[in-house]
Amino acid sequence: MARHNQKIGMKRIDLQLTRLSLGTAPLAGLFKSVDISESDELINTALNNGMNYFDTAPLYGHGLAEERLGRILGSITQPSKSYVLQTKVGRVLNWVEKADPVPWFPDADPHIQPVFDYSADGIKRSLDESLKRLGVDHIDIALMHDAENHISEAINIAYPVLADLKRQGIIKAVGIGINFCDVAIEIMKNVDLDIVLLAGRYTLLDQSAQKKLLPYALERKVDITIGGVFNSGVLADPKPGATFEYLPASDEIIKKAQDIGAFLKNLGIPLTAAALQFPLRHPAVTSVLTGSRNSKELLANMADFDLELPEDIWNQLEDAGLIEKLSL
């Protein structure tokens, strides 16, 4: 079994990623305010416990996630040995005179608004501004973010810009951050990606990625990072009022999550531990991305990720009809 701080080499790029990685939307105050002292402690906890792979984006906190991550990472004297930094392009942050509070990110400055921009200038501007917010001189991995409505621009405009920046050494790897398997496959068929961050499509509730995307990624030697392993909450605590894909979960989804949880409980296995470890069942998956709001949550996720599970647990869930059979 993998441990949270175990490193694995990327298939195409000379980078080592820890099996458990840290997403930074929660530390930027996703849905609920987070004090900067909490975010500092969280990032230091990740580093002090051997995690090296950090994912961020201009969207998260409208620049706040990158700024908070940069407070800690920017002070490290040997960054290449300490962390792998992944951010995203496809949106720029514009200042507006009149603005309403941001419901998703209450800590964000409401005058700073994200706008999709897949133009060549927009991609360059996004990266330049990310470098400044992060306080670093290079990005390890740049992902095209939420390109489902910008597929042509991602393929024909953004990717060539990123490929050129990769040749210049400003970035080391190019990928996409996406929620849709079909979009990921279409982009992969047209450009030479190094990595895909896929949210919510290879979890205990949704194994749709294994039908086509994960086998294709193996064939193309493209690394896969799986995010959204709790499907935004229902797999962490499947009770009425839980969320699935950031919306109220249906009774059917809650019942399915409860059934999986009850089956695992009879075996003495926490649902959260199984949810965190499940994606690594597929050989295409390199890392599991978890978002944490504070160091307590992160330490709990590390413990769940490191918990030893029975070798046949996934087969047992298959036999019980609770997950799909593995498809390679």
Task: State what each model feature region is.
Residues 12-30, 88-114, 143:
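N-terminal small/glycine-rich loop or linker at the start of catalytic domains
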Residues 1-84, 93:
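N-terminal binding-site loop/beta-alpha segment at the start of enzyme catalytic domains
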Residues 3-7, 38, 147-328:
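Beta/alpha (TIM)-barrel catalytic core signal, keyed to glycine-rich beta->alpha loops juxtaposed to Asp/Glu
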